[in-house]
């Protein structure tokens, strides 16, 4: 029985997925029962919901049903506390006190994090019961680095859970000594200076207050090789090194999330946390700024919010504080000409992904490709670039000084080499849900056609769709005058970007022109040498009015609305404004002035310009270990640096390695559970050091596979798992045969950038109509039967559209799995695909690196973009949003057959990024809550646009908006999600970011600054200075420091912190090599100084570079022995 609310069609879809999962599970289980694998069963438990995931990942046994009951009755957070209480009370088995407390904290944290992230497993090292100096007992939670994956709120709640467990166990509070209190302050400062910064920088007194009042000890294991110098060798602190996990829980958990903890404390009635109220009140403004980037703007005159008032927004500069070399700044914070804020959601945006016109993606020299990450000014910290061609495109000035609106990709490609300046970058389409998620005040909307149409509807005016989308210029003016409505957005220029005096200068110049009947244009005399004409021409450019420049004239084809906007009656050829000087003097600003002289209302085109810079480039590539290997079969140093087992066999080499093994009754050493030489069942023990019989295993594997000669097969040097149990060599040979690679857990993966999509056209995903019908896509969004490839269909929540290169790679993986079934397990081939398109309909797993739970998905097609398209719910099920992160896909049968927990590294974080449990059915209630804020409307109401002018909080208008949250627990939670803006093609635009195609750092930075030079909203000198200061200088200093502290290494793989006294490798006697080269130290030196000179950086920067140069020279250049050329003697 299906446990989620869904329509009959969706229920059938989920049943089909479950049936396919069961089929693959059964097949893989049969293969494992043959005894050739590490275990004789599939090692990935299936979970239908959060409760199953929690039990599967952290336990205890039989807890799932009770979690379901409690969550249903109480809600998630109260249920987590109650389940922790019941565990320590022994309701799920008898545990020792410390074991019970640890189990309680882990299980409660798993409930809070939906049983997806690895934090409950890896983020909590252990829980201990320790003693205060007065002899009383208290609880200590040992946090580890992976607690970061839980997020700040969950980190804080883990501490709250610990306090709740402590009370229920009758333990006393933690009573720290003064040295222990001060130790935290020292560690926080050291962490920020030597490791990385926190989101929130706490004051020393805040840390002291928190540590003295938190009832459990927040401690942890050492995470960084940096030691404290002051408060060392404390009896109850086991290490002198930084405890990174503990600091994260304290600073980014308890201190940063204080308001959220207080809400839970008040709601749950937990005592002992009142001290947080005082702490919160002292720093509430700081917390809100970091958490929500709220209140980052102000109005000059809040009592009058009409469109004629000046409007100022405070620029958010955080995103541009650090600029990486080779990654352009597209717009400085809130700079005129930047990305214009526009509200709405296209079918490929939302959930932190914003839409941009595909034309601008080409005009910035391909630095904005589909899937490229941008760091943005607002509403969130980052976004992902996707094309939406129904929003405003860029406005550019060409080399011949003409100004042109680039509204198609064809135009962008035609004129890209002729662009002198990008005057306006175009729109950035942001959905209401992203403002709601970030609790960012709703900023005034730009003047757009959807707002305009709402006004016409509200006044019951007649109009055609063609008029809304592309009105004739005369028709637009006539309609505005007759109906007394604002001028159509198409002909509303950026009057607010120039002053009222500038408008008057431009007006005087334009009125002096004449009408050219031959080409229906307004013609003006143009002379670049005339400063007055040049100034007026610049104002024409800045308002974004298209015009063509010839040798002696400027021709304006959109003359009709332009002239009428400036108070000139074109039809009567007369100026209709009286006393222009008086109006200029009596109006308060540009918008007031233009509305005074125009015969109709003119709205402000843009209120908000959003700044942005490039973050990470898009990614679509197979997952490889470093170096890439084909199998988890260790060969030590026998394969030399290239790690080729076939080369080791040819040269007769072997090596001693530590590995699980057993002596078989046949006399051979078996590394597997089934002896490959006699077929007997054995049980390897160990690990122990043995001389590996590489040659014997190699030829036996080839014999088993009936392969005469294999190509190059790359293997690992040694296992890092606890038992050091290995994978059969046959799998490595078959992977190499099919040109694929293995990951640490035995699976074969493909990584790609997460991008949302809720609707698609068959033509976009390269799948036939009949195949889509077979997969359950019978009707389009309008309810019409699916008949052609251009109809828009709603994506089912567990279907994914993979990159083309992923399909090619999975084609090879399917060949490997079929070979494995046929040649190794002696079973029928499963996939039997002859071309990549035949993989459509097969199941995969989607997984994020910081999690331990996978989600079942189904391939329904591929796109040319280097991104992984999936439903926002699907990404949210992996605890991800879509702001530029990347996750992995891998074939479900591959995971069932080849994954093993016993391959995972025996170190902290080793169980992250491994499918320890698999969710089969996606429940929207149990995914990352951020997606619940995504709006699901087909159009925004007029009230939204009007309210946006008031600068209200997003929650205040939630009642007039529709979000995913409103659909939960209803059949409509899976279907009928709307979008407001159409786009023709989801993978339109550059497919590869220029950053990935350029070679040297000099090439990258030159291209970066070339982009900055031609964008009006960017200051190239500032970009150059920021690149030097935030990237090059820290790298130069860091590499210089690393050189002086470096260790040495040997070609055999041995590493030494200091040079051995013998001067050679202690293992093999070979010459030792430096780990940091001279080239690594000075690689950015020349490019930094070249940039500083070329872009006239400040004297401070130039002098700092000179100091670094002298430091490098003092290290590498011998002052006493100076190399000279022979010609120097003849000077």
Curated annotation (Swiss-Prot):
InterPro entries per record: PolC_DP2 (IPR004475), PolC_DP2_cat_dom (IPR056172), PolC_DP2_central_dom (IPR056171), PolC_DP2_N (IPR016033)
Keyword field: DNA replication, DNA-binding, DNA-directed DNA polymerase, Exonuclease, Hydrolase, Multifunctional enzyme, Nuclease, Nucleotidyltransferase, Transferase
GO biological process: DNA catabolic process; DNA-templated DNA replication
EC number: 2.7.7.7, 3.1.11.1
GO terms assigned for molecular function: DNA binding; DNA-directed DNA polymerase activity; single-stranded DNA 3'-5' DNA exonuclease activity
Keyword Methyltransferase: no
Function: Possesses two activities: a DNA synthesis (polymerase) and an exonucleolytic activity that degrades single-stranded DNA in the 3'- to 5'-direction. Has a template-primer preference which is characteristic of a replicative DNA polymerase.
Subunit structure as annotated in this protein's UniProt entry: Heterodimer of a large subunit and a small subunit.
Reaction(s) catalysed (UniProt annotation): DNA(n) + a 2'-deoxyribonucleoside 5'-triphosphate = DNA(n+1) + diphosphate; Exonucleolytic cleavage in the 3'- to 5'-direction to yield nucleoside 5'-phosphates
Protein name as annotated: DNA polymerase II large subunit
Tree of life domain: Archaea
Organism of derivation: Methanococcus maripaludis (strain C6 / ATCC BAA-1332)
The keyword Ion transport appears for this protein: no
Homology family: Belongs to the archaeal DNA polymerase II family.
């Amino acid at each position: 029985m299906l446990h989620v609310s869904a329509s009959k069609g969706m229920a059938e879809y989920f049943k089909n997925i479950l049936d396919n999962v069961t089929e693959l599970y059964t097949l893989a289980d049969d293969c494992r029962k043959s005894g050739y694998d590490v275990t004789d069963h599939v090692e990935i438990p299936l979970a239908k919901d959060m409760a199953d995931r929690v039990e599967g990942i952290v336990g205890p046994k039989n807890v799932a049903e009770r979690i379901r009951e409690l969550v249903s009755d109480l809600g998630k957070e109260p249920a987590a506390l109650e389940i922790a209480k019941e565990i320590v009370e022994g309701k799920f088995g008898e545990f020792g006190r410390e074991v019970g407390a640890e189990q309680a904290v882990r299980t409660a944290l798993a409930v809070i994090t939906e049983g997806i992230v690895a934090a409950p497993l890896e983020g909590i090292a252990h829980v201990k019961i320790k003693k205060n100096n007065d002899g009383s007992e208290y609880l200590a939670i040992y946090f580890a680095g992976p607690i970061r994956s839980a997020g700040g709120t969950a980190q804080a709640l883990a501490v709250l859970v610990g306090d709740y467990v402590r009370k229920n166990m009758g333990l006393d509070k933690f009573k720290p000594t003064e040295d222990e209190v001060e130790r935290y302050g020292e560690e926080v400062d050291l962490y920020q200076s030597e490791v990385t910064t926190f989101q929130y920088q706490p004051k020393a007194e805040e840390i002291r207050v928190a540590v003295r009042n938190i009832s459990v000890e927040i401690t942890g294991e050492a995470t960084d090789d940096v030691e404290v110098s002051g408060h060392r060798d404390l009896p109850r602190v086991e290490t002198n090194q930084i405890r990174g996990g503990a600091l994260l829980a304290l600073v980014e958990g308890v201190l940063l999330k204080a308001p959220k903890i207080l809400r839970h404390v008040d709601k749950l009635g937990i005592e002992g946390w009142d001290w947080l109220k005082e702490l919160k009140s002292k720093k509430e403004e700081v917390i809100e700024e970091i958490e929500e980037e709220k209140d980052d703007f102000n109005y000059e005159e809040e009592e009058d919010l009409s469109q004629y008032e000046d409007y100022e927004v405070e620029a958010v500069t955080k995103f541009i504080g650090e600029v990486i070399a080779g990654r352009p700044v597209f717009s400085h914070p809130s700079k005129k000409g930047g990305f214009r804020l526009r509200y709405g959601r296209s079918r490929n945006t939302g959930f932190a992904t914003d839409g941009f016109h595909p034309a601008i993606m080409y005009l910035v020299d391909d630095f904005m490709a589909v899937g490229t990450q941008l760091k943005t000014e607002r509403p969130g910290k980052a976004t992902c670039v996707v094309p939406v061609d129904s929003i405003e495109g860029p406005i550019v000035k060409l080399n011949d000084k003409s100004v042109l609106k680039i509204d198609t990709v064809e135009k962008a490609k035609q004129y890209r080499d002729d662009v002198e300046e990008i005057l306006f970058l175009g729109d950035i389409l942001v959905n209401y849900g992203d403002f709601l998620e970030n609790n960012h005040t709703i900023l005034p909307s730009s003047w757009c056609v959807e707002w305009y149409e709402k006004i016409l509807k509200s006044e019951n005016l007649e109009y055609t769709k063609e008029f809304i989308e592309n009105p004739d210029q005369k028709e637009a003016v006539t309609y505005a005058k007759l109906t007394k409505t604002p001028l159509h957005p198409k002909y509303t220029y950026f009057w607010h970007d120039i002053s009222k005096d500038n408008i008057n200068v431009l007006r005087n110049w334009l009125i002096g022109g004449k009408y050219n009947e031959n080409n229906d244009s307004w013609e003006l005399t143009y002379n670049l040498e005339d400063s007055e004409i040049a100034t007026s021409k610049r104002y024409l450019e800045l308002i974004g009015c298209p015009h063509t420049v010839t040798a002696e004239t400027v021709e304006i084809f959109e003359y009709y609305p332009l002239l009428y906007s400036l108070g000139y009656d074109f039809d009567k050829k007369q100026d209709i404004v009286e006393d222009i000087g008086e109006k200029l003097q009596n109006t308060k600003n540009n918008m007031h002035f233009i509305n005074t002289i125009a015969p109709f209302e003119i709205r402000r085109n843009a209120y908000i310009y959003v700044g942005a810079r490039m973050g990470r480039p898009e990614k679509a590539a197979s997952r490889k270990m470093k170096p890439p290997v084909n199998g988890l079969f260790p060969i030590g140093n026998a394969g030399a640096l290239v790690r080729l087992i076939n080369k080791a066999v040819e040269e007769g080499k072997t090596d001693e390695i530590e590995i699980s093994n057993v002596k078989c009754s046949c006399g051979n050493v078996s590394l597997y559970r089934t002896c490959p030489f006699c077929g007997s069942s054995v049980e390897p023990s160990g690990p122990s050091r043995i001389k590996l019989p590489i040659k014997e295993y190699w030829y036996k594997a080839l014999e088993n596979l009936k392969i005469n000669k294999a190509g190059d097969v790359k293997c690992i040097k040694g296992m890092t798992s606890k038992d050091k149990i290995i994978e059969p060599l046959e799998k490595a040979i078959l992977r190499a045969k099919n040109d694929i690679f293995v990951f640490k857990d035995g699976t074969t993966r493909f990584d790609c950038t997460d991008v949302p999509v809720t609707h698609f056209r068959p033509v976009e995903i390269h799948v036939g109509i009949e195949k889509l019908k077979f997969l359950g896509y019978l009707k389009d969004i309008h309810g019409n039967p699916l008949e052609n490839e251009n109809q828009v269909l709603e994506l089912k929540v567990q279907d994914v559209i993979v990159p083309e290169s992923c399909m090619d790679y999975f084609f090879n993986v399917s060949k490997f799995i079929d070979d494995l079934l046929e040649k190794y397990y002696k079973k029928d081939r499963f996939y039997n695909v002859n071309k990549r398109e035949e993989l459509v309909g097969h199941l995969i797993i989607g997984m994020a690196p910081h999690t331990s739970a996978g989600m079942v998905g189904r391939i329904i097609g591929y796109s040319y973009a280097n991104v992984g398209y999936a439903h926002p719910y699907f990404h949210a099920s992996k605890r991800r949003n879509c702001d530029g992160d990347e996750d992995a896909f891998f074939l479900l049968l591959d995971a069932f057959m080849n994954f093993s927990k016993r391959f995972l590294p025996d170190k902290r974080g080793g169980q992250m990024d491994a499918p320890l449990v698999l969710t089969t059915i996606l429940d929207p209630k149990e995914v990352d809550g951020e997606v619940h804020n995504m709006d699901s409307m087909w159009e925004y109401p007029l009230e939204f646009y009007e309210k946006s002018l008031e600068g209200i909080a997003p929650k205040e208008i939630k009642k007039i908006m529709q979000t995913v949250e409103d659909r939960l627990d209803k059949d409509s939670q899976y279907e009928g999600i709307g979008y407001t803006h159409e786009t023709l093609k989801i993978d339109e635009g550059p497919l590869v970011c220029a950053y990935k195609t350029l070679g040297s750092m000099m090439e990258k930075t030159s291209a970066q600054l070339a982009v900055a030079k031609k964008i009006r909203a960017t200051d190239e000198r500032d970009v150059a200075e920021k690149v030097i200061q935030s990237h090059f200088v820290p790298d130069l200093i860091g590499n210089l420091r690393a050189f002086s502290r470096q260790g040495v290494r040997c070609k055999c793989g041995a590493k030494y912190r200091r040079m051995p006294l013998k001067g050679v490798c202690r293992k093999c006697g070979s010459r030792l090599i430096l780990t940091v080269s001279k080239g690594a130290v000075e690689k950015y030196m020349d490019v930094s100084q070249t940039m500083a000179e070329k872009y006239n950086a400040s004297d401070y920067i130039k002098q700092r570079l000179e100091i670094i140069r002298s430091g490098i020279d003092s290290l590498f250049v011998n002052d006493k022995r100076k190399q000279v050329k022979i010609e120097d003697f003849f000077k």
